[in-house]
Amino acid sequence: MILDTIVEATKIRVAQEKQVEMPEAVKAAALALPSDTGFPFEAALRQQDFNFICEVKKASPSKGIIAEHFPYLDIAKEYEVAGAAAISVLTEPDFFKGDKKYLQEIASTVKIPVLRKDFIIDEYQIYQAKVWGASAI
């Protein structure tokens, strides 16, 4: 089953990432950031009667590559202008072709909350999300 395959790949990837960026350092960096980033995710979703979260996604296991040319910052800016309450950014690299840089750059560009979308299996990834600029996971 594809989900099992993705979870197993995620376990391997997270173990490798922990060798590059030590968990204690990532946790310390996350905890050193302000607890209120100015992008309260829940508040953004409660601002109107109808809200939407738009997704920035380059590929999926079922569809393959969705966008060969992937102007992720332009896409995110267009979502914000269109009235999105938040933006979901794929960071899973193997099956969705996501990248932490997409999250980092989008989070530093838009004024609405940004969600890290990945297969979260370890608290390490939660601290990564905070360091990378995510408002939610």
What kind of feature is each model-predicted range?
Residues 36-43, 47-48, 53, 96-121:
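Alpha-helix-loop-beta-strand connector modules within alpha/beta enzyme cores
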Residues 66-90, 109, 123-136:
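Alpha/beta enzyme core
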Residues 24-32, 60-66, 85-106:
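Glycine-rich, proline-tolerant flexible connector loops at the mouths of alpha/beta enzymes
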Residues 3-67:
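An N-cap/entry alpha-helix motif that binds or orients negatively charged groups
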Residues 55-59, 66-70, 93-97, 116-126:
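Glycine-rich beta-to-alpha transition loops that act as phosphate-gripper elements at the mouths
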Residues 52-56, 87-89, 114-117, 137:
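Hydrophobic faces of well-ordered beta-strands that scaffold small-molecule active sites
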